């Protein structure tokens, strides 16, 4: 799951120049964060914790949480941070590393990119007591040059997009290797199955609506490889897909059905 919250900018007028250098709209940032926490982060974290316990640790998930999101949780909604810590303590949750600010520094500056990744790595260690071994770049952007930079930082695995125009006839449901010195494992997101939940779940015009646990499980079993990597915005649950759509019930029964 991806978790990100930007620092929102306030309206800054021409006549503010020279009078104030506070560019951020803290009130809006706090208001939006607390709304999403109530609708998504808190109930979904509770659901995942219940499923981890119910399945005796056989159910595992991974989070990629930006540094700006962690800062906002700490400042405006510490109960969300506590709920992520509770998940971390189960030993069934992995925290991935990424750029601290959800930036595209990997495309512009190697020193800045490495600085942000190491800053984010330190934040994960501070908040959750984990040292990340898997890296995912902003928007899953990937290239051989990025793999080399990530390799030099010691990461063992990279998560990226299973882009059809790159894969061609190949499947995203296998573990690949990078061209970097230490040939990290390369995990590819299954865009179709991920987007079925993230974007199409509540679309009544979709030919496969409604999406049930049994139907989705049959698609997973029909996979043509070793693994299926699902990766989506965490706000899918309760924010993008409303609770009334049944998204929480879907996720409640999916782990045990798969396991």
What spans do the regions from the language model cover?
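Periplasmic/ER-lumenal interhelical loops and adjacent helix-loop junctions
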Residues: 235-238
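Catalytic alpha-helical scaffold of carbohydrate-active enzymes acting on polysaccharides/glycoconjugates
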Residues: 1-134, 140-196, 202, 206-225, ...
């Amino acid at each position: 799951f991806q978790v990100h919250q930007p620092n929102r900018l306030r309206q800054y007028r021409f006549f503010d120049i020279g009078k104030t250098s506070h560019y951020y709209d803290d009130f809006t940032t706090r208001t939006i964060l607390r709304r999403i926490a109530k609708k998504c982060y808190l109930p979904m974290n509770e659901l995942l914790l219940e499923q981890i316990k119910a399945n005796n640790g056989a159910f595992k998930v991974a989070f990629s949480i930006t540094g700006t999101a962690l800062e906002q949780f700490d400042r405006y909604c510490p109960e969300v941070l506590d709920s992520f810590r509770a998940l971390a303590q189960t030993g069934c949750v992995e925290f991935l590393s990424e750029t601290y600010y959800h930036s595209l520094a990997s495309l512009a500056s190697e020193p800045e990119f490495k600085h942000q990744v190491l800053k984010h790595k330190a934040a994960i260690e501070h908040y959750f007591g984990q040292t990340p071994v898997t890296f995912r770049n902003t928007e899953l952007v990937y290239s051989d040059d990025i793999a080399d930079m990530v390799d030099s930082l010691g990461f063992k695995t990279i998560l990226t997009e299973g882009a059809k125009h790159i894969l061609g006839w190949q499947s995203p449901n296998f573990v690949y290797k990078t061209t970097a010195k230490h040939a990290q494992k390369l995990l590819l997101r299954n865009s179709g199955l991920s987007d079925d939940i993230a974007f199409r779940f509540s679309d009544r015009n979709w030919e496969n609506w409604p999406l049930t646990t049994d139907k989705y499980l049959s698609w997973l079993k029909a996979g043509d490889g070793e693994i299926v990597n699902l990766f989506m915005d965490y706000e899918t649950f309760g924010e993008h897909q409303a609770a009334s759509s049944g998204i929480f019930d879907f996720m409640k029964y999916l782990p045990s059905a798969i396991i």
